[in-house]
């Protein structure tokens, strides 16, 4: 069982997370217009070590192939989890850290069932997860005005999310 990894130009053993990564790369190319020459996978983003290995971002996207070639800051970091894995808050912070280390403006966490997009809030501590509506398309990447507009489009609550939050607040007030 193998899956083709275009960013590595080779066939890899199919593992659940690898399948998610390759399917998301296809989405980046087909839906967002990114070129494989402006992306990389499993890129080391820091010199520190987590556990036994160094921190590696699943997918890294630059504004252009030229920026990738000259080791400029990344534009978007994507953190993938296997489809069977429930994404936890720690996973969002892992993506945030990778994006901050790589100098990216955006980060995505996905297991394909759930995909959430965040902007990296630079210059503020503690880290804040600010969810936004989408990542820019490749055509928008070099248009600062459009990127800024997208960074300012925060995600609205869905009815279910709002109901859950209201229910939690109600219980806190009732129990105190």
Task: Give the role of each language-model region.
Residues 1-176:
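Non-catalytic, mostly N-terminal accessory regions of nucleic-acid modification and defense proteins
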């Amino acid at each position: 069982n193998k899956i083709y990894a275009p960013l590595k130009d080779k066939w890899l053993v199919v593992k659940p997370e690898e399948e998610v990564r390759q399917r998301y790369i296809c989405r980046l190319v087909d839906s967002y217009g990114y070129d494989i020459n402006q992306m990389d996978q499993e890129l080391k983003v820091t010199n520190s070590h987590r556990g036994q290995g160094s921190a590696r971002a699943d997918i890294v996207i630059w504004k252009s192939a030229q920026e990738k070639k000259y080791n400029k800051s990344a534009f978007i970091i994507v953190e993938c989890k296997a489809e069977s894995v429930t994404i936890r808050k720690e996973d969002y912070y892992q993506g945030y850290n990778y994006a901050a280390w790589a100098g990216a403006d955006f980060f995505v966490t996905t297991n394909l069932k759930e995909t959430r997009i965040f902007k990296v809030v630079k210059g503020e501590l503690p880290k804040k997860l600010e969810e936004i509506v989408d990542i820019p398309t490749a055509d928008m990447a070099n248009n600062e005005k459009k990127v800024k507009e997208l960074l300012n489009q925060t995600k609205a609550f869905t009815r279910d999310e709002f109901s859950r939050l209201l229910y939690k607040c109600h219980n806190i007030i009732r129990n105190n």
